[in-house]
Amino acid sequence: MDNETGKTFLDMARERWSVRKFTPEQISDVHMARILEAGRMAPSACNYQPQRVLVLQSDEAIARMRSVTHWAFNAPTVLLVCADLAESWKNVDGCDSAEVDAAIALDHMMMEAWECGVGSTWVRGFDERVMRQAFGIPATWKIVAMMPMGYPAESARPSIWHFKRKSNEEIYRFI
């Protein structure tokens, strides 16, 4: 189905790239609401919705984030996406869906951000213990990733790795 820009999801997936340079402008309330709604509407196992997201926007929160990892870049907003292991579906062999569910929510927010003209990148480059302590993350939450985001700087460009894609034959196996 086409969105208001007339682009399909596949168009956006092909266009989107990891933005690592941002303007200092804070994300508008309208865009932020749309991005967060996309995460809320993401599918999850048995609709348990274990995703928990810290929205870091205050100067103090961003400074704290930058003190524990340099991978926040100069983003004016960082989402710290977690999975509540106490509120997630587990299958009969104990496999917990929480991290996958939170990752799906993160991806939904990332794609909606792109639709809004907001760039982002998926980051797992941090010490979880330090991050947990810095932001008072509950013991039942697993930190899945952080998503620095903001409006792309004029000088922002995709990395050289963005254009390297495996072939269908390397990825898919029809049985």
Indicate where each model-derived feature is located:
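Acidic, surface-exposed loops and disordered segments
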Residues: 1-175
